[in-house]
Amino acid sequence: KKVYGDDLKAVYDKSSGTAPFKAGLELVDGYMYKKEGFSDDEQVVLENGHKFIVNWTEGQKTGFFLDQRENRALVGSLSKGRNVLNLFCYTGGFSIYALASGALHVDSVDSSKKAMMMVDRNVALNGFDPSLHTSLCCDAIDYLKNVPEGKYDLMIVDPPAFAKHRGSLKNA
């Protein structure tokens, strides 16, 4: 609160599902701080001029992966004039940057219907021509197996963690 002052609207702790079990911490997801009048519903966040709908409570982890900010910017810098494939797209962060940077077309692929609806909403929120983007709700690996050679100039492959720790590596 000292850093953001009145601009701080909420602090939501969502570490119960991500903190190592061995840490022995009793973690409960919830608000650590919430400004009066702050809605629990979706919020729009702004990153480098791009808007993203985020649901802190319902989304995966935080609902938006802040640690990928530099990678999204890198994808943007490589996307102009290219056909882009974003596999495991979740809410479409890489897709938005590619579109904003002048990609010819972006295909976003994820197996989650909910995630694909969010990608479409984020594309609309940022005012992109919907004909430049296609959302494909299917298994990303199966899709990749059937992609014709040369269809894409740039591919983003950012899968979820299949194994969170060494003990579950065999099952992953």
Residue ranges and their predicted role:
Residues L154-A172:
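Mobile active-site "lid"/loop adjacent to the S-adenosyl-L-methionine
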Residues K114-I156:
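S-adenosyl-L-methionine
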Residues L8, G81, K151-D153:
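Local beta-strand N-terminus motif with an aromatic residue
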Residues T91-L104:
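Conserved SAM-binding loop of SAM-dependent methyltransferases across substrates and taxa
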Residues L66-R82:
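Conserved alpha-helix/loop element of class I SAM-dependent methyltransferases that forms part
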Residues K2-F64:
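Non-catalytic substrate-recognition/targeting regions of SAM-dependent transferases
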Residues G81-Y90:
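Conserved class I S-adenosyl-L-methionine
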Residues H105-D110:
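Conserved SAM-binding motif I beta-strand of class I
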